[in-house]
Amino acid sequence: MNFNNRQDLINDIREWASNDETSYRNWIRPTIIFSAGSDLSYFDCISEWQKTIPVIAARYFSCMGLPMSINQVELVLTDEDVEDLANGLYDDYEEEFEETRARYHPDRYPDDAERFGIGTGE
């Protein structure tokens, strides 16, 4: 964990979050389900991701032996850091988001529904 190199810290949190089952189950998957089910625009999706970043980062720091509250995380991470993490995690889970969105709204996203075999009996 390197607080001096912001990009390394962001990359570490992103990689860790992508591999942490608890973060996925408690924050990442619910964010995907909410965003896809609500059929949010890209910018609204990023806004939802930004809301989860402080919680995920607090868990990251705690697992790294540096327990922090969400308020403390917000002092460590800049708005730009949170935005970078939100964009990165969205990118990591974009395909899962598209599949979930197609399951909720196959009529609005027929190409995605077909791509994921939704409603085709496959």
Predicted segments, located by residue:
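Acidic interaction surfaces
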Residues: M1-E122
